[in-house]
Every structure is written in structure tokens, then in C-alpha cells.
């Protein structure tokens, strides 16, 4: 029989407190996920037995106004939410979530025709042996040449050009920094750095993870690892990390927390997506099981 005796369960999903509007009209304030996305809910009542349920709000308008507008009203959507949530939204990319290729980037130029959706991947993709890569030793350094940093880097709402020599930036993550990654692993990456000082995942390292290590999923702490860059570059060179991994049917799970608290360099990971067809991403409750007494 399978047993977790001798293992410690470590929470990898950030705890999120939703903002919720109760049926009595009261509002309970919430917070946002690590990426700054709000979790917004409306409470409803099930008439047959007077039980309560919650609706994940997709816009700032009240439910009735949303429904009425959706069935044929012309013009912009109503903007009269008592919650003041006009710019807030809920998608399957809120909180810790796993994303696949089909339905997410399948419209991009140059992606493989055989790219799969989450619902088409084997269950074993989302659980199993995982390499823990805490990259706290990759301290930011002064850039020596223009070519050793991504062409574009997001910071707040601005797009910065390539880093110039002498500027402080995160280091490139290389295969030599991931020596504990074994073939067929799930890989969990984190670092204590943020912003421009985060170590960044280069395309040559992603290629090594795909072709040599044949990893089955990549999990990323946030902040800590920069992997979403070159977003505005013309296809087929845009978003290279996402493009390469999802194109190889290797899902990405993020934003994760507590990776840096794991003492061992190997754990058992579990984090299942919802069993829903055509869902390009799914909420997950990600957990790492660390063997007690084991360390790196």
C-alpha cells in the first residue's frame, strides 16, 4: 500500500483571500495572488434548499446586468458595480495554475500541430519525482555584454531595451546550475531575487531541459525566476520559454510558493488540473512531499 509515512507535505500554492459580495449586500475585502490578480466572488442562493454557492465574477458588473447585456444589448458592458471591480477579472490563470499549449498558444505562428491540451495529457504528467532547484546562489551581477540578457524585460508597465554593460541584472540559468535534474523529472525552480535581479531561464537551457533531461513539467516560484520575456517580439520568436515548453507538451505551473523552504533537492510533487476539456489552464493545489531526514 502507498504510504506517506516519513514525508512532510509542503504547501506550494499561495493562499488567496477572495473579495466576496454576500447575498445580503455586504462586501468582504480580499487580496490578490502573487502576480497581482484579484480573486472576485459573488454569493448566490440555491432556492430549493436555501444553501449558498459562489460565482467567480468575470467583470465588475452585477450578475443580472452581465446576463442581460450578454443576451443582446448593444454597446459597452454596464459599469455600475457596487464592488468597483471594473478592471478586475477571473480566469483560469489566477492563483497557482497549470497551463498547457492547446487553446492557449495554438493560434501562434510556428507552434507544433500536435500540441496537446491539459485534458489530453497523461495523469502522470502532474505528479511524480521532482528536482528542487533553489537558485539562491545565482546572485545578480553586472552585465558584461549586451547579448547575455533577454532583448525585452517587463517591469511594471514599461518595456526596457536590452541591458547595457555595467547594469545589474540576474544571471542566466544554465544546465550546470540544475545538476540535480534527472531524466523525466518535474522541475521546481525558485530564487530569493525579484525584478531585474531574478535569474532568467534562457532558450538554450530550456532546450536542454526538453531534449536532454526530457522533463515532464516545470514549476516556477514568483517572484524568483524570469521566464516571461520577449513577449512583443514578432512570431515565431515571441515568448520563447512558453513557446518551447508548451510546444513540447511540457506544462508550466506557477506562481508557486515555499520552494525555497524545501531542504531536500528532491521531492514528490502533486498538483492536478481540473478534468475539463478545452480548459487551456487550470487552478491547482500544488503540494510537495519531502522525505524527512533527507537533505541536499
Language model features with spans:
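Active-/binding-site microenvironments in catalytic and ligand-binding cores
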Residues: 1-296
Amino acid at each position: 500500500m502507498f504510504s506517506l509515512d516519513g514525508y512532510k507535505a509542503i504547501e506550494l500554492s499561495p493562499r488567496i483571500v477572495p473579495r466576496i459580495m454576500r447575498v445580503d449586500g455586504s462586501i468582504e475585502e480580499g487580496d490578490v495572488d502573487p502576480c497581482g490578480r484579484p480573486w472576485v466572488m459573488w454569493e448566490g442562493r440555491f432556492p430549493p434548499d436555501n444553501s449558498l454557492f459562489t460565482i467567480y465574477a468575470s467583470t465588475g458588473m452585477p450578475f443580472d446586468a452581465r446576463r442581460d447585456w450578454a443576451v443582446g444589448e448593444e454597446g459597452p458592458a454596464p459599469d455600475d458595480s457596487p464592488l468597483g471591480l471594473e478592471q478586475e477579472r477571473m480566469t483560469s490563470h489566477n492563483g497557482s495554475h497549470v497551463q498547457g499549449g492547446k487553446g492557449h498558444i495554438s493560434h501562434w505562428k510556428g507552434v507544433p500541430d500536435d500540441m496537446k491540451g491539459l485534458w489530453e495529457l497523461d495523469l502522470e504528467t502532474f505528479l511524480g519525482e521532482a528536482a528542487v532547484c533553489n537558485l539562491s546562489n545565482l546572485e545578480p551581477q553586472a552585465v558584461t555584454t549586451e547579448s547575455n540578457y533577454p532583448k525585452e524585460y517587463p517591469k511594471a508597465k514599461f518595456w526596457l531595451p536590452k541591458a547595457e554593460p555595467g547594469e545589474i541584472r540576474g544571471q542566466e540559468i544554465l544546465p550546470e546550475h540544475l545538476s540535480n535534474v534527472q531524466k523525466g523529472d518535474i522541475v521546481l525552480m525558485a530564487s530569493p531575487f525579484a525584478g531585474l535581479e531574478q535569474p532568467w531561464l534562457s532558450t538554450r537551457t530550456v532546450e536542454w531541459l526538453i531534449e536532454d533531461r526530457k522533463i515532464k513539467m516545470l514549476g516556477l516560484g514568483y517572484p524568483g525566476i524570469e521566464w516571461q520575456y520577449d513577449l512583443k517580439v514578432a512570431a515565431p520568436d515571441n515568448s520563447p520559454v512558453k513557446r518551447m515548453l508548451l510546444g513540447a507538451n511540457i506544462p508550466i505551473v506557477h506562481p508557486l510558493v515555499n520552494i525555497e523552504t524545501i531542504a531536500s533537492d528532491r521531492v514528490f510533487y502533486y498538483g492536478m488540473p481540473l478534468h475539463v476539456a478545452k480548459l487551456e489552464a487550470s487552478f491547482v493545489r500544488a503540494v510537495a512531499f519531502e522525505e524527512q531526514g533527507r537533505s541536499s
